[in-house]
Structure formats: structure tokens, C-alpha cells
């Protein structure tokens, strides 16, 4: 469920009431499903949008009161560590220098690692919801708007490269909805099959081709592309642009897709503590 909890954060600095309501409805539905299936223990975390929002703690309080779900707001260091746990669960790193690209709605994280040890981290405000709100207003895409988005990404990614110093990745891994959607589109995987998505690889040329096709389409035409999840039809442009410009900035010809990420990292942490 794509509820766009971080919508409006750039301009308001807080979670929008309607998006909080949408998210609370989804959480309530999740809670009901759990109650109908033996009431297993729940572990919920919040990241960028709730972490940064002036009313983030209000949202957490409401979630507890209205749904019974305890949400923990985790710092970026813990988010990065748990994300890597999930990513490397089924993708061997072979002691290579890796950049893991985690694209969210409010932010995008760049996690540097070698031998599963984090050697660097950079969190940016390059989230797909934020970028779409700021740069994209027309579908099919207006080229002037897209050029502004592209220039912004290139500028921000140069700052990321500078912060990460001389780190040169041997492997680029992508996680979250944008990259899994790109893999599904490239390989025409429908219905969605996580086992076919995980560890799949697409090239810079693949990303360029998919982006060019998406830019020409209206929102309804994109939705007709079955692998594309409803609610992602406008966000996929900014997401694909992030992927493509990252590949260019770090001179990576391919990206390996991880179906597993923060959620699986949390599960592994729980299992390992038993």
C-alpha cells in the first residue's frame, strides 16, 4: 500500500493530516489481519518521513492509540545496518566494495560496505514523493521539467560522491519499490513474483530505455503496464531518474536488485536474538 506519508514534507515540515489518516487505515487493516491469524507479535518501525516531521511523535502516538501498533522511530544508522542485513541475506557480497541504494518516498540512502561492514553512509532528501512534488506536474513528461529534475539530481549526486570520497563500488545494489518495479517492467513479471525479482540485474541501457518509454506515456497508459503498481504511476519517473543518474555518477553499468531490505533485516534481528 502506497500511502505517501511523506507528502508535503518539503514545504510544510510535517506529516499531512490526510496522509496520516490513509496510513492509519492501512495499519488498522494490517492489525485486523494479524488478529484473524493468531495475533502474532508485531514489530513496526518508522524512517525518514516520521523521523524528520515535526508531528512524527504525534503520528506514532495515534498509531498506538487507534490501531494498537507500537511504532519505533529508528535513527538512520540503525536503518542502514538493518537494511544491509536484509540485502545481504541472499546476495553474497564476496568481500566486494558495495553501494546499496535505498530509494524511499522522502529520502534516498547510499550505504557503503565491504564484507558486510558499513564503511560509509549518506542520506539525502532525494525521495520520489519529494522530487515528484517539486519537479513533475505533467504526464506525459514535460522535457523542461524533466531537465530541471535531472540537473538537480546530478548536482546532489556530485555532493554525495564528494562526501563518500574515493570509494569506488564494485557492485551497485538497489532496493525498494522503484528498482523492483524496473526489474518487473524489464522482464515483464506479472503477477509480481519476488523470487524472480530478487538478484535480477538490469543495465544502464535498460534503465534509459524504460525511462524514455515511461516519459512518453500518460498516467493511465503507465497503469496499463501491468507490473506497475497503482499509486506508483507518477512516482516512477523520479525513481527511475534517481537510479539512472546514480549509475552514471558512480560509473556503474549494471544494478543488482534486492527484494529483501529493512523488513527482512528486522526479521533476522529478531530471529538471531532468540
Residue positions per predicted region:
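Conserved beta-strand/loop subsegment of P-loop NTPase cores
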Residues: 40-44
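Short, basic and Ser/Thr-rich N-terminal targeting/leader segments
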Residues: 104-106, 175
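Helical "lid/coupling" subdomains associated with nucleotide-phosphate turnover
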Residues: 3-4, 8-37, 47-97, 112-115, ...
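Acidic, divalent-metal-coordinating active-site segment for phosphoryl/phosphodiester hydrolysis
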Residues: 106-112
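Short glycine-aspartate micro-motif
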Residues: 98-102
Amino acid at each position: 500500500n502506497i500511502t505517501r506519508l511523506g507528502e508535503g514534507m518539503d514545504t510544510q515540515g510535517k506529516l499531512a493530516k490526510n496522509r496520516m489518516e490513509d496510513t492509519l487505515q492501512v495499519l488498522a487493516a494490517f492489525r485486523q489481519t494479524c488478529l484473524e491469524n493468531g495475533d502474532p507479535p508485531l514489530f513496526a518501525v518508522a524512517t525518514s518521513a516520521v523521523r524528520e516531521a515535526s508531528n512524527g511523535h504525534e503520528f506514532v502516538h495515534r498509531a498506538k492509540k487507534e490501531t494498537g501498533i507500537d511504532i519505533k522511530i529508528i535513527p538512520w544508522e540503525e536503518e542502514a545496518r538493518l537494511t544491509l542485513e536484509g540485502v545481504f541475506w541472499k546476495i553474497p557480497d564476496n568481500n566486494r566494495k558495495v553501494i546499496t541504494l535505498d530509494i524511499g518516498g522522502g529520502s534516498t540512502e547510499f550505504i557503503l560496505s565491504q564484507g558486510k561492514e558499513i564503511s560509509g553512509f549518506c542520506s539525502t532528501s532525494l525521495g520520489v514523493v519529494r522530487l515528484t512534488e517539486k519537479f513533475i506536474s505533467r504526464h506525459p513528461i514535460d522535457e523542461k521539467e524533466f531537465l530541471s529534475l535531472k540537473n538537480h539530481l546530478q548536482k546532489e549526486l556530485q555532493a554525495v560522491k564528494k562526501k563518500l570520497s574515493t570509494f569506488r563500488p564494485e557492485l551497485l545494489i538497489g532496493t525498494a519499490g522503484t528498482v523492483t518495479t524496473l526489474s518487473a517492467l524489464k522482464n515483464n513479471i506479472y503477477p509480481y513474483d519476488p523470487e524472480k525479482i530478487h538478484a535480477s540485474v538490469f543495465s544502464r541501457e535498460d534503465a534509459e530505455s524504460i525511462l524514455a518509454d515511461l516519459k512518453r506515456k500518460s498516467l493511465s497508459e503507465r497503469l496499463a503496464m501491468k507490473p506497475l503498481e497503482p499509486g506508483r504511476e507518477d512516482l516512477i519517473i523520479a525513481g527511475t531518474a534517481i537510479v539512472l543518474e546514480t549509475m552514471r555518477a558512480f560509473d556503474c553499468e549494471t544494478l543488482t536488485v534486492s527484494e529483501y531490505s529493512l523488513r527482512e533485516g528486522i526479521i533476522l534481528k529478531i530471529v538471531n536474538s532468540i
